[in-house]
């Protein structure tokens, strides 16, 4: 199966299709909640980032086993991931400069000020592991793909998966705990 000389698009596309179906199922549950349109967009972007990094990881594995795959496919998935991370970066900058919340002591704080409190520290961790580290890794992945080293790129994508999952875990904590969708 892995040693085949021909590319079977069904096996490459199936994980993506399953991911899209689950994304639609999750988004249907999210639409039951009364949120602003911008909140729905950033939730969709967040899930899309996770789906894209997993797709890139699976695609990277195919490059390890099927030599004939054009490297352009993996480059395109990394470009898409970079684009989604840039959107999240702009959203986080917007949120940090404009959002306010009330902490446990009843004090209104800007989100940027909240980062430097005891309760807000993990949001800083979420931004670091869920945004800054993946952006830096994407630069490394891109240059690794430029030298046609798909094995190294796949390893870096693995690190990006772990970083994004770790960051997303903390993002979700703040969404549930404080109602902050960042």
Residue ranges and their predicted role:
Residues 142-163:
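Interfacial loop-to-transmembrane junctions
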Residues 95-98, 152, 174-177:
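Long, hydrophobic, amphipathic alpha-helical segments used as structural scaffolds
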Residues 20-24, 162-169:
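Aromatic-anchored segments of alpha-helical transmembrane domains
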Residues 1-134:
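Long, contiguous internal "core" modules enriched in hydrophobic/ aromatic residues
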Residues 128-141, 161:
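Hydrophobic alpha-helical membrane segments
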Residues 168-182:
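Juxtamembrane boundary at the C-terminal end of a transmembrane helix
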